Each structure stands twice: as C-alpha cells, then as structure tokens.
C-alpha cells in the first residue's frame, strides 16, 4: 500500500508535467496569459458560458456551444491557433464530525485505506489534461486524461466526441419554418453529453474528495459505467425548443478497460446493448429560462465481469427541471431538480452472495439545489438530497449475509464559492480559479438516524484550470 507521502510525490510529478506543457503554450501567447482552450477558440471569457465563471454549470450560451459540438469559433491571434489543450488541478482539506476508521490488521473494514489519517486529510484530488475544442470542421471533442490522487491512478476520464450541424426548413421550398441543430455524440459515460446540470455527470456538487464518507447508494446511471462503456447517441434540437436524443451503450473489452486505467472487482460488463434516451423542452422568456425533461436507460449488467450467476437488470427513469434567472448577470438565481427511479433485479448479485430472496428491488434518488451568484464571482448554493430504496444484504469476509440494510439517507449541502478570474474585466481573465467552502449535514445515513451526524463533513476546495 502506498503512503499519502508517496502519492503526493507522484501527484506533484504529474502536476509538474501539466504545468510544463502549459508553460510551452503560455510562452507563445502575448502577455503570457494562461488560456483555457474553449476561451481561446471562441474569443469569449469563461463567464459567457458558465454562470459562476468556472465549473460545469452552464449558461444558455454554454449549452448552445456544447450542442453545436464544441466547434464554435470567434477567437483570433496566436491564442486561437494553439492546440485545444488545457490542464486542471483540484485539492481539498476534509474534516468529519467524527474520525473515520483507517484500515489495519485490527480494522480490516476501515472506511479509509491505510496510510491516511482518521480526520483532517489534505488530498490532491485530481490533475487532468484535456483536449477540448474543435478537431476538424464540424467535429469537436471534450476528452480528459486524469490522475486520481486519492486512488493513485491514471485513467481515461470523461470523453465526448461530436459531429454537429444545422438545417433550416425555411431555406427549402417546404411550407415550414423549423430550425434543426443535429448531431452525433460518441462518449464513454451516460449523461456526459447532456446539456443540463441536472443529470448525474454534471450535477451539483461539482467538487468532492475521496476521503469524505460514502453514504447511501447511487443508481447505475450515476457514474457506475464511467469510462467502462462506449456509446453513440443521435440528437436534435428543434426550434431551440424541443430536444430529442437516443442511442445505446456497450462495454469495452477487459483489456481496453485496463488500458484506460479501469481495474478492480467493481468493474462491470454490459450483456448486450443498453439503450439510452433523452427528451427535454426549453424556453427563455426575457431572461427567465425554463427546462423540463426526462431521461433513462435500460441495462443488463454482469457484475465484476463474472457471468457465473447471470446478470443484474436495471431500468433507470428520471425527470428533471431547471430554472435560471439570467436577465441581470449581476444577480443570477437558479433552481435545479431531478428524481431518478431505478427498478432492479439483482439475481446475479444475490446468487453470488447466497441470498435466496427473489423479486425486484428499487432505488429512488431525489436532488434539489438552489443557487445565487453575484457578479458571476461569489456564489451560494444550498442542496437537498434524499435516497430511498429496498433492503440490501451486508456480507462478511466470506460472502455470507450477516445483516440487511436500507440505503435510505437524507442530507443537505451548503457551499460558498469565490471565482476571482474568468471575466472580461478580470486580471488574467482567461485563466481560472475556483475556491469553495462546503458543508454536508446528515439527518439520516444508510437507513438509520442514529449517529448520522457523525458523517457531517466540512471541506475546503481549490480548483485551478490553465
């Protein structure tokens, strides 16, 4: 087991490599400004696409840029001619109300790996190198190579490669005036291609740490397939009103997963194609933006790539909604919510655990977050999460069932954000830094109210893009 000190040395080496690469880019740019690739390509500062000038949360303009396949131009000069490369680094300090247990001979089931402290851990959470922007013509990409400082692993992160174009029936002899933006997305994580910040990949919270307590459960569509599958979806936006998307995912081979840095007993293999769909309505009434949507996925999964006991079957269906007040960019108000219902038939996992029970189980996940942003610099977000589900078994070291537990959990997240750069009037307006204070408070954790507050977590996060 490698210690945090050794992990830190390796993380510094990876970060130094990123900075060295970025320095080559910086030295070729007037005034030596660090320019994220999307900003260089479009000539726009980060606040045009992002409500808080940094992070995944998109403005209507940012959603249009993604819908159009990351190919929009507008930049000029030396910066616009540079390769579409960017770097990113994240770190955090995490405190929990009660010390966590650390794995050892006496605590084999500790919640933290050996080498970490029970509390007040600093983690170099992530360092990433991106290719993000136009590839050629109407083809663009967002792709990520990531070093996970907690897991001490280099892997392929999120990837979304798109072809996109536009077609207007008004330009034809047909008696219709319909405008279509259409495209194809090749990606490796369901919902990574989504335009809205209600779906799992780009939903709040945008930062976290590997050392924070793991509470509740998540549906399959929420990260369980990331970088382990490849998918193709076709989409269209009609009259900037109706969005339609459909496609399917299949598993990468075991060797491909290994080459992407995905290994371990929690790997999954899809048995056949897994259909995915998305539909949404959106409209902007003079700065009041509304969206209402639905998305879902059906998958047959071979857990751990071991087909001895067959497959687990999942059907995930969700509804989501977004409101943004963007009429006055000094004061941005947002409300976002989603509910995901997962129907499960876990016959493979039951067979492996010797569980004789039959029938379907379920998992329900509700998320709501409210946000206020001042001057696209200072942000306050409050979020509420609730998880409900069927009983699931707890296994001992030899795989026997020793107890049953529900994943039921209730908690809130409060976050303060400061983003000093990314605006047209900012010093170094095309580089970016996001700092945040985050507190997570639990009233229920893993099916019990008793001692749920011991999981309460305070984090200080720093996030740099260059």
Regions found by a protein language model. Name each.
Residues 80-82, 120-124, 152-156, 223-227, ...:
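Transmembrane beta-barrel outer-membrane domains
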Residues 97-105, 153-158, 195-201, 255-266, ...:
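Outer-membrane beta-barrel translocator domains and adjoining extracellular loop/strand segments
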Residues 1-11:
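N-terminal secretory signal peptides that target proteins for export/translocation
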Residues 58-59, 89-96, 103-104, 116-254, ...:
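Outer membrane beta-barrel
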Residues 45, 414-420, 454-466:
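Outer-membrane beta-barrel "beta-signal"
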Residues 21-31:
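C-terminal segment of classical bacterial N-terminal signal peptides
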Residues 43-53:
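The canonical Cys-X-X-Cys-His
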Residues 287-420:
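Detector for outer-membrane/organellar transmembrane beta-barrel domains
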């Amino acid at each position: 087991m490698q210690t945090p000190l050794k992990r830190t040395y390796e993380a510094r080496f990876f970060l130094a490599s990123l900075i060295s690469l970025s320095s080559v880019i910086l030295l070729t740019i007037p005034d030596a400004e660090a320019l994220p690739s999307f900003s260089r390509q479009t000539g726009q500062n980060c606040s045009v696409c992002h409500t808080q000038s940094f992070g995944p949360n998109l403005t209507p303009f940012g959603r249009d840029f993604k819908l159009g396949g990351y190919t929009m131009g507008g930049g000029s000069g030396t910066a616009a001619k540079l390769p579409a490369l960017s770097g990113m680094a994240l770190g955090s300090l995490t405190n929990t109300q009660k010390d966590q247990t650390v794995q050892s001979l006496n605590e084999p089931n500790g919640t933290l790996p050996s080498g970490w402290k029970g509390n007040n851990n600093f983690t170099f959470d992530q360092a990433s190198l991106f290719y993000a922007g136009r590839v050629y013509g109407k083809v663009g990409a967002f792709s990520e190579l990531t070093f996970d400082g907690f897991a001490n692993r280099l892997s392929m992160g999120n990837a979304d490669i798109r072809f996109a174009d536009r077609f207007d029936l008004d330009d034809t002899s047909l008696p219709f005036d319909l405008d279509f933006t259409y495209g194809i997305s090749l990606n490796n994580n369901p919902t990574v291609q989504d335009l809205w910040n209600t779906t799992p990949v780009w939903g709040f919270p945008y930062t976290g740490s590997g050392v924070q307590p793991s509470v509740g459960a998540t549906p399959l569509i929420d990260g369980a397939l990331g970088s382990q599958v490849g998918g193709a979806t076709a989409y269209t936006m009609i009259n900037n009103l109706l969005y339609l998307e459909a496609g399917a995912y299949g598993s990468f081979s075991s060797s491909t997963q290994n080459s992407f840095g995905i290994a371990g007993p929690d790997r999954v293999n899809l048995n056949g194609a897994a259909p995915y769909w998305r539909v949404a309505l959106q409209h902007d009434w003079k700065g009041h933006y509304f969206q209402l949507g639905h998305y879902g996925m059906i998958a047959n999964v071979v857990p751990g790539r071991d087909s001895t006991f067959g497959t687990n079957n999942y059907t995930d269906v969700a509804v989501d909604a977004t409101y943004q007040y963007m009429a006055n960019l000094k004061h941005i108000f947002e409300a976002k919510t989603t509910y995901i219902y997962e129907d499960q038939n876990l016959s493979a996992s039951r067979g492996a655990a010797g569980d004789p029970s039959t029938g379907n189980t379920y998992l329900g996940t509700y998320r709501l977050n409210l946000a206020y942003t001042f001057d696209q610099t200072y942000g306050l977000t409050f979020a509420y999460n609730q998880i409900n589900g069927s009983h699931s078994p707890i296994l001992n070291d030899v795989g026997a069932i020793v107890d049953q537990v529900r994943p039921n959990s209730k908690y809130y997240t409060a976050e303060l954000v400061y983003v000093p750069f990314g605006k047209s009037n900012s010093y170094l307006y095309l580089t970016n830094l996001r700092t945040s204070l985050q507190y997570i408070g639990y009233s229920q954790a893993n099916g019990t109210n008793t001692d749920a507050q011991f999981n309460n977590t305070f984090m200080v996060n720093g996030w740099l893009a260059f």
